């Protein structure tokens, strides 16, 4: 059908011509019906009567067949006319759709919406809307959690660094916004009023009210350990080995529990005699 080319006007003209032919054939058959279906015997003998009956039967049978052929012809002409009209309507619809391609889609969408308007009750429609809203919120929450866990190794280091820099830039913008809000709260007039009116004290520039002599208040306190008069205790005498930490040779006691302890085990190795 993709290679079929149809001209509706030509189909209509062909149907009209075939209709004319069928009407002419029907008229001829009707004219021949009387002399061919009622034949009189040539004589009064039996043979003439049998011949007349045989010719009458053939004439009657021809009229029956021609009537059936006329019915089939009329049906064909009718079908051809309907097909021509259908092709014409389809061609006009295709032309209008090609001129505005979205009109057909819009019409189909409107038909679908109208068909499904009363399909779901209002309570189910609200439930479906809530499900869609909750699903969208869950997706957003999952995305936020993934971004928050990026520092735990879920993302490569480069992507994590880019995310951190982006967050840092947003924080800096937030601080600038806070400073701007503070300036707006203080007002421009209050800030400009105090400019250039402070007096200098040393290397500082302070308001005039601060230029007076300040009273210094200080108290002395005794440092801990300042009253110690006893001599520092002397370490116990012991035997030390060069290269080892100094530890007493006394027996073990509970004071050294938990501290590292070192032991020395002498190793005696024979030396080869040399001559």
Swiss-Prot record:
Read off the InterPro entries from this record. Answer: PE-PGRS_N (IPR000084), PPE_C (IPR022171)
Full protein name: PE family protein PE8
Subunit details? Forms a heterodimer with PPE15. The dimer forms a 1:1:1 heterotrimeric complex with EspG5.
The subcellular localization recorded is:
Secreted, Cell wall
Which keywords fit this entry according to its UniProt record? Cell wall, Secreted, Virulence
One Gene Ontology CC term in the entry: extracellular region
Domain PE intervals: 5-93
Which function does this protein serve?
Answer: Promotes the intracellular survival of recombinant Mycobacterium within macrophages by regulating host inflammatory cytokines production and inhibiting cell late apoptosis.
Q: Which SUPFAM superfamilies match?
A: PE/PPE dimer-like
